[in-house]
Every structure is written in structure tokens, then in C-alpha cells.
């Protein structure tokens, strides 16, 4: 997608003029010794990451590193450096062009802390899963150390941590609004979203001698700059006015968000900034945004143009070693073990779930690979993965079943400002055909040496019910005992705040799934995921969800509690107490109940684990306070018994469920579990 006047060169159309073609490095170097073997006296670009270096397209630094290598640059990697001093950041010498800094595949605070702000003791992106190998606010710390190491080298931020902190944002862990990470890190540029186009442009122009401040015309770039003369400023306050559409102006337009200082003090202003940012997320019609930080203006260019299928193929066909760097020896990297036999077939998500960061980072436009590229990668997995058993562990992406889905009309797509293509109902302009995906599944199964192809990515069931043929194909060939899906709740109030379909859609999918399983002679189970303590959820909502779980004989072994990640719409609800999905105006905004106290958050978690005796005391207390003591007792329609087993009830959630009389549950290590009837 692009605007009618914008010319977007193909992703791989450039090559560094001064660079002679060279053979790709077996691995991007992590030491001077490796650089010496390659005959390098210096790196052009040094990438610093909070993850272990795995040379595989599921790891962002590998993609960016190999992409820049393909452009003729010498690229080195500094992985999980000791941040206590600048010395480890000098390990590869002074880069000629820039430092690229990322926290890794996850926001470092999400990686290091639970939803209850408790420190995690493991890290899936670290050798042997060891925790503590990256600092809090990893991107910020690494950037500051890079500046100490070499003051005059440009620093470019990227990755999901930088993307979701590109403007003033609420930080759950410090419980305050923080400045853009670009300001705190004192970096030169921030590239947000999937940044292949931007990083190529930035690298070539910096190498040609331009200064970072001159790169103000690149999509997906955030930087500090002055608003150019003759630019028309529209204030975010006016964008929800009844006549906003009639008052739209032509020419160079920028939208001025409430300032950093204003959103720190005014929660409604924060919600308004969030609303406008999400409205301006379509690459086809997004306008630049500007937000004052002290005496400077933070400028956000419109989002990057999505990659074409050919460009997606070129990214995933780069010469990855498809293994961790040899310096890790025999150490196990849990994230690598999880994905080494999986295949990404697409990017993006048009679901728009308010608690999710995928749309903010990857966008709503689905970017799909070709069948040929996907099949080629599967053959590489078969031929190059030690101990490969013939099972592809997952074929999907952010969701399992949006492959090649798109708006039926490119003009409508480029002008749309809706945050979701499927809420409150599936848009009539959306092509929901699963035919391409079904055909892909069948071709993958035909690859020699492939025994099973699993679908482990979350299935978007509101789309799946539109294609009985897809459900049949899925159940017949790609489910291994259970299938995880995410209704998230049963009650309309929280579901509307999440922008999720009603529970009736789940029931339709369940009926179709069970019918297909019966026809295929299989005994499969659905594993539903639910969220506790999401904004807009009342205690009564959680009680009704618990009753639904009991009626349907589900037990949750693990509980997912809402975690306010930076820049998500639900986080704006949590912080501001108003709904940015609606018009935000002082005194007229729709209020949203936010579950903030630890006591209430634990109560909501306890409702999801109603069957755990350790939770019964707090549930009895809550039910009495709610006037629902009638739900205390041993009848099937009651939620918790009146008696308390000895030795239980001391600390909610610290013990495994006690199995009572009746049918024994079928247990999985998942967030939801179906009981066998």
C-alpha cells in the first residue's frame, strides 16, 4: 500500500557503491577474532541486542544484520553485553556508519517482570534460560553505553521496545508517564515497526555522509526536529469534532499531539494522544505526528509501507545460518528450541485487540510470503536442522489464519481509519477466504520428509467460522490433541473494551470444531485463553466468567493477568480511566473501570481458578460482599464450597488444584484445560 503520489523503490534495489560483492559471513561476527578471519579491519554497523544472537529470521537482529549485509555493509553483533561499563560496547571497535540498538524480541520490562511486577528468574532468549543478562529498559541503557564508548557515532534505536515507547507513554513498572525513549536514550533516530525499508535507507544515506538530522523524510522514523515552515498544524483536540472531516485541509499537514508535559498531568490528554496515534496508523493515509518534549518537538513520520510478497521472500531467503552463534557451545536457548522447526508465513494483524502490541508494531496490513519461499524454508529445516524428526512445529505468524487476507478494494483500504477489520463485526470489504491457506497446508504436507505440520499460532476463530473447509482441514491434519484459541472473556463489557467477538462466536467455532473432529475420528480439545483484570472488567464479570467455566467444565491451570504494555489502547484505558475507542473530550469521555489494586487483581485471578481451594476464602468473601452468597455451597450450580480442606486457603494460587470427586480432568501445561466428560 502507498499513497497515489509516493514512489517506493523495491527493498533490494540498492547496493553500497563502494562495497565489492563478498560472500556472506557464516555468522555475523561477535568478536575481533571473527572479524580478522573475515579480513575486516572494522565494522560499518554494530548491532547491540538484549537477546542471544541466533541467526534465524525469527530473531530481529538476524534479519536486520543479514539485510544490511546484503546491501554491502560489514555488520557485527554485540549480544547481551555487560552494561556496567562502556568497555564491552567497544568489543568490535568503532563502527564506521552507526550503532543499531534494540532490547530484543520482547520489551525488556515485559521480559523481566510478571504482570504483578515480580521479577522473573528466567529468560527464554538467553543461553540456558538464565535471567539477569539484560538490564531494565534495555534499549535506553545500551544506547547510553554506546554513546560513552564512541561519542560521535550515530545511534539508531529499533525493535519492539523502542517502537512501543516512541512517544510519551505510560510505564506500568514505574507507574508514571515517561518521555519518548528517544529522548531518554539520547539517540539520534528511532525506527519503529518492521524497519527493513527504513534501515536500508538510513544506512545508505549515513554512509554517503548525511547527518542523522537530515533523514527527516523517511517513513517509520522518529526524530527531534523543528516543524517546517508552511506546514499546517492540526491539533489533536479537534480531531473528534463533528465537522472534522469537512475541515480537512490539503497540503503539508502535521498533527500536534498533547505535549509530553501535558499527558503527564492530564489523563484525558493521554487518552486523546493514544486515540489519535492509533487513528493515524494506516500507511495509506497517516499524517505525521509531533509531540512537544520540553523545548523540542518529537516528530513521527507516517508508518512504513508494508512489504510486498516478493520483498517478504527476499527477507526470509537471506543466508541465515539457522542456528545460535557457535560461541554458545551446547547451551540451550529456550526461544530457539521453541521456533527452530517453525515457519513464519505472514506478518501483521487486523484484529486490533486493544491489549496486544502486534498492530502497533507490525500494522494491520497482512504481508504474506509466497508458497515457493515457504516451501523452500521447510526444505532447509528438513536438511539443516540437527535431529529433525519430520515435524514442523508451527506454520503461521501473529495469527494462524490471516494468510493473504486483505481489503477487497485498495482505495478503501488506504483511506480507512478503523482500528479493526473484524470488530464489532467483520468488515464487508474484507476478503476472508481461507483457500490460499488451505492450498498452502496441502503443499507443505507433500514435501518429502515432512511427517506432520502443526498449527500452534492462535487461530482467529471469528474468521475460521467463515470457512468450514478450513476448520475441517485444520482438524484433520494440523491439530495435535488440543488447539489453543483466545475468547479472552465471556462478558460483553470487557469484550467490547478488548475489541473481541462475543462468546457466541466461540460457541459456533466449538460446534464446528467438534463436528470436524468427530468426522475425522479424532478426540481433540479446545484450550481457551482468558484474561483477568482487563480494563472494563467488573467483579461481576469475573464471577460470570467463573460460572461459565464451571458449567463448561473448564479449569485454568495457569492464569493470564492483564499487563499494561506501553502504547497499547488498553493501557491508555488502564492509566486514564477513559475509553479512547470513543471520542475523548474533557468532561464527556466514556469512563472505564481500571483494575489497579493488587487485591482486586488477585481476586479476578482467583475467579479464573475457582476450583483451587487456596482461592476459596477470598472468593467466599467477595461473593458475600457482592450479595451472591447463594453461590457458596456444594451444588453443581454453586461456585465454591462452604467448607475448607485442611492445609489450604493460606495463599491464593500457591498450590496445585485438588482433584475432587467426579470425572478426572485431562491436564495440559496450558492456560486453559477441558475436562473429559
Curated annotation (Swiss-Prot):
[4Fe-4S] cluster binds at residues 349, 353, 356. Binds 1 [4Fe-4S] cluster. The cluster is coordinated with 3 cysteines and an exchangeable S-adenosyl-L-methionine. Residues 335-601 form the Radical SAM core domain. Keywords: 4Fe-4S, Iron, Iron-sulfur, Metal-binding, S-adenosyl-L-methionine. Pfam families: DUF3362 (PF11842), Radical_SAM (PF04055), Radical_SAM_N (PF08497). SUPFAM superfamilies: Radical SAM enzymes (SSF102114). Residues 635-677 are annotated as: Disordered. Signal peptide: none annotated. One of its GO terms (molecular function) is 4 iron, 4 sulfur cluster binding. PROSITE patterns: RADICAL_SAM. Its cofactor is [4Fe-4S] cluster. The keyword Transport does not apply. Belongs to the UPF0313 family. PANTHER family: UPF0313 PROTEIN YGIQ. This is UPF0313 protein RPA0679. It comes from Rhodopseudomonas palustris (strain ATCC BAA-98 / CGA009).
